[in-house]
């Protein structure tokens, strides 16, 4: 088990929920540290309270997040937990930004759910380079924008839907 790179965010400011497979901790943690180093608040499973029902903590963190950062690998694409988190986020109008850490193909169900969301090809890049590519889109989404099919952004309303502004 790799050491946790930093505490998960627990404040009231906008934050990103990180979706990854535990099997990928060694690959994922440098990316988390690099994005966190860009000043972006991240919640990941380090934020699950001891003794709490983990599924409730995860659902609460997903509902409170402005965006989900999905670190796509063969392990995360095969993970039922990752599928559940992505489906829950999209069902609650939380946008998902996928970053491909390795060459992998999404399952048909993930392709269906994520087909209207832009992704970042991060293969061949180190964690710092990937963080540089995702920090701008994450910052825009944290400021209240949501990606649309046309690539434009709209403000999210408090109810979680898109609204014009």
Where are these regions (language model features)?
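SF2 helicase/translocase ATPase core recognition
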Residues: 100-101
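C-terminal helix of von Willebrand factor
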Residues: 124-148
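CheY-like receiver
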Residues: 145-164
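Conserved N-terminal substructure of TIR/SEFIR domains
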Residues: 1-70, 90-94, 104-105, 137-140, ...
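Short amphipathic alpha-helical segments
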Residues: 29-32, 81-84, 110-112
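Glycine-rich, charge-decorated loop segments at or immediately adjacent to ligand/cofactor-binding or catalytic sites
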Residues: 104-117
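Conserved TIR/SEFIR loop-to-helix hotspot centered on a Trp-containing motif
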Residues: 74-94, 106-108
């Amino acid at each position: 088990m790799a050491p946790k790179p930093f505490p998960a965010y627990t404040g009231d400011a906008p934050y990103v929920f990180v979706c990854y497979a535990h099997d990928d901790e060694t690959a994922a943690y440098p990316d988390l540290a690099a994005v966190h180093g860009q000043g972006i608040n991240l919640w990941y499973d380090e934020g699950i309270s001891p003794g709490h029902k983990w599924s409730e903590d995860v659902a609460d963190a997903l509902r409170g997040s402005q965006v989900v950062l999905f670190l796509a690998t063969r392990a995360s694409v095969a993970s039922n937990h990752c599928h559940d988190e992505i489906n829950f986020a999209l069902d609650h109008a939380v946008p998902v930004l996928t970053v491909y850490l390795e060459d992998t193909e999404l399952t048909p169900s993930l392709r269906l759910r994520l087909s209207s969301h832009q992704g970042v090809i991060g293969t061949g890049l180190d964690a710092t380079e990937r963080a540089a590519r995702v920090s701008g889109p994450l910052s825009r989404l944290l400021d209240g924008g949501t990606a649309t099919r046309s690539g434009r952004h709209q403000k999210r309303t408090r109810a979680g839907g898109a609204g014009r502004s």
